[in-house]
């Protein structure tokens, strides 16, 4: 019997490594006569793994009766499809539900099952016979039994769907699972619930959910946080049930889960702990033109996965789109696919599953159509991306950065603070690692707090531990002083500011440290601070005032204000700064504290990240702007030695020589809405 495991950002079948680059093909939505020539096109693309759902409601032809061999309809012949994949030497990712969504009736479950939420006893009793039946049929195809199935997905994008199952979840007028969660969450302590909610309930059954955030009411924000925590609890309950059942039925290959891309409805790290791997589902608009911040969100999703996952992985990566979304996302170009894939690699992706590689009902703009014919422009782009992935081999790369940014899954699923800071990091082109406050301590020693004024006790203690162990925590404009229910909690003992000064009508130009100027629309003022005070001096405004008000504007020049402090704590340091977290300020802090920025473009719109393997460095760069751009990339002091370097474009194979001096000397040009990957090798070893 073979062993299948996940390690070193790959799946291993005994001693054979398998990189997770795959594509989705749905057998029951294609004419079986087209299976072979369609899969031949997939092979020509260079893909070696095929993923597929199996639809419960399609295979259950009568209650408790299943057709997996095509007796009632050739498209139901799951076994023939698995046999063909095996014959063609594809590895297989099997995704049998019970929910699959997949733009399919009822999301793939039967008409009877859909009446019940998936965490209910009724739903699970209906689902388990199908789960056992499909498992029994597919067991011989598991790689542990000499077959080709290497991963098994349990359910799909698990979600309580509170808008659909409101009453039965206890979110409306009567109690249910939500109240069961509260009893567990508050450890049967009704007084603790009443303190947190500022209520006087006589039983948990009286508690009602706040399922919409009202930001102006702190009490309701706290109650909303409990609603979001209920969602995470529910998802974990369902995931545990699904994974447990499949394992009981004999599945002994790694079990995977998928999740929405925003880290809100599901806690990714929890799902990976319940199973073996979790991946996000990412569907941006064409060339990031229709929704703001899409590239940043792709990169952030992979940065976060990089902090905890065995394989930073996209379980569903856009390849075509559901017909109802075409108006929202636009018609996809070859550049679109190159841009999003190189953006994912920049963020740290080590694998993905293209969904869908082949058109089918309700799904269009894939590189292969239902007849096995290709759309040449897209097919060629996918083939090029596959070759680039193989040449890069992201599974063996080491990310180069000394900077971390905190990540709270609870905050991310609720009020989502810290967005201005994350945007500023992106605009400054400063790469970083996320520090998951629910996970292990980061090994980075320079961390920025990207959160709001509330943070749970557990997470505040995590920050204190980080500082005590030698980390430098920087809070810009916001620091934790309350728990998740907006009750006072200041475990970091952060000095509160005494006032806020505005720079209306524009931003103030300020001198901070010795590294030039920063701008901020407001200042948080401090009178008495621990440690060393941080002082800014107002300079002449960068916005030229009208002539008649020039004298009034000049009155503020030279004024100095204490806007924070820095002090040692244990083996580390805490720095608190009452300014906007602008790109200029974040860069100035790196300079002041001698923290190198691994790679940084001098032109806006170009985003970079630096990785290394053995003695070589890999610069991944994208141009998200609408026009071609050239940029000089600066490398962190001391990272790349001065002298001659060989630069190879992994996509085109073009090779050139550059001379680096103090990290300067690398110029790149990128087409609009595209990217490139460069290998930098010391010239003497090339």
What is each model feature region?
Residues 106, 110-273, 295:
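Polysaccharide-binding and catalytic clefts of secreted carbohydrate-active enzymes
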């Amino acid at each position: 019997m073979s062993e299948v495991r996940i390690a070193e950002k790959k799946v291993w079948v005994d001693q054979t490594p398998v990189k997770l680059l795959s594509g989705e093909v749905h057998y029951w939505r294609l004419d079986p006569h087209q299976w072979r020539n369609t899969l031949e096109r997939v092979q020509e693309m260079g893909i070696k793994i095929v993923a597929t759902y199996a639809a419960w409601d399609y295979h259950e032809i009568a209650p408790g009766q299943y057709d997996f061999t095509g007796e009632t309809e050739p498209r139901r012949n799951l076994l023939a499809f698995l046999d063909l994949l095996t014959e063609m030497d594809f590895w297989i990712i099997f995704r049998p539900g019970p929910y699959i969504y997949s733009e399919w009736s009822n999301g793939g479950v039967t008409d009877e099952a859909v009446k019940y939420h998936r965490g209910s006893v009724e739903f699970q009793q209906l689902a388990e016979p199908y789960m056992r039946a499909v498992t029994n049929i597919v067991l011989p195809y598991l790689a542990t039994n000499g077959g080709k199935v290497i991963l098994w997905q349990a359910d799909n994008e698990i979600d309580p769907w509170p808008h659909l199952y409101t009453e039965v979840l206890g979110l409306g007028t009567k109690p249910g699972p939500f109240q069961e969660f509260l009893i567990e969450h508050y450890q049967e302590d009704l007084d603790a619930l009443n303190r947190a909610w500022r209520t006087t309930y006589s039983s948990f059954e009286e508690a009602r959910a706040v399922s919409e955030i009202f930001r102006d009411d702190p009490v309701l924000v706290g109650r909303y946080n409990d609603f979001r925590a209920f969602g995470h609890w529910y998802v974990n309950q369902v995931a545990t049930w699904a994974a447990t059942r499949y394992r009981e039925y004999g599945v002994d290959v790694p079990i995977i889960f998928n999740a929405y891309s925003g880290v809100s409805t599901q806690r990714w790290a929890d799902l990976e702990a319940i199973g073996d791997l979790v991946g996000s589902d990412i569907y941006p608009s064409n060339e990031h033109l229709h929704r703001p911040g899409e590239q940043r969100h792709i990169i952030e999703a992979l940065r976060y996965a990089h902090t905890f996952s065995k394989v930073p992985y996209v379980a569903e990566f856009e390849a075509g789109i559901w017909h109802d979304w075409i108006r929202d996302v636009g018609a996809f170009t070859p550049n679109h696919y190159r841009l999003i894939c190189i953006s994912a690699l920049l963020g740290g992706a080590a694998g993905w599953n293209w969904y869908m590689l082949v058109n089918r009902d309700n799904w269009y703009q894939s590189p292969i159509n239902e007849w096995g014919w290709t759309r040449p422009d897209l097919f060629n782009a996918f083939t090029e991306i596959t070759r680039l992935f193989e040449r890069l081999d992201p599974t063996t790369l080491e990310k180069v950065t000394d900077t971390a940014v905190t990540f709270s899954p609870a905050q991310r699923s609720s009020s989502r603070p810290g967005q201005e800071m994350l945007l500023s990091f992106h605009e400054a082109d400063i790469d970083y690692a996320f520090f998951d406050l629910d996970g292990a301590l980061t090994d980075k020693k320079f961390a920025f707090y990207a959160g709001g004024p509330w943070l749970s006790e557990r997470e505040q203690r995590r920050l204190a531990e980080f500082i005590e162990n030698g980390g430098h925590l920087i809070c810009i404009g916001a620091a934790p002083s309350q728990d998740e229910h907006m009750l006072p909690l200041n475990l970091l003992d952060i000095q509160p500011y005494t006032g806020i000064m505005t720079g209306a009508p524009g931003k103030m130009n300020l001198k901070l440290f010795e590294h030039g100027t920063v701008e901020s629309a407001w200042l948080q003022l401090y009178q008495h601070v621990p440690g060393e005070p941080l002082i800014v001096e107002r300079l002449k405004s960068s916005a030229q005032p009208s002539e008649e008000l020039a004298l009034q504007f000049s009155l503020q020049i030279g004024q100095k204000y204490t806007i924070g402090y820095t002090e040692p704590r244990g083996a580390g340091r805490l720095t608190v700064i009452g300014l906007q977290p602008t790109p200029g300020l974040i860069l100035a802090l790196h300079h002041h504290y001698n923290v190198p920025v691994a790679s940084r473009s001098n032109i806006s719109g170009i985003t970079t990240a630096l990785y290394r393997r053995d003695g070589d460095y890999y610069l991944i760069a994208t141009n998200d702007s609408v026009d071609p751009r050239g940029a000089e990339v600066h490398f962190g002091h001391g990272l790349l030695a001065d002298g001659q370097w060989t630069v190879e474009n992994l996509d085109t194979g073009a090779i050139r020589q550059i001379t680096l001096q103090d990290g300067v000397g690398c110029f790149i040009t990128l087409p609009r809405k595209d990217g490139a990957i460069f290998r930098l090798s010391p010239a003497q070893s090339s």
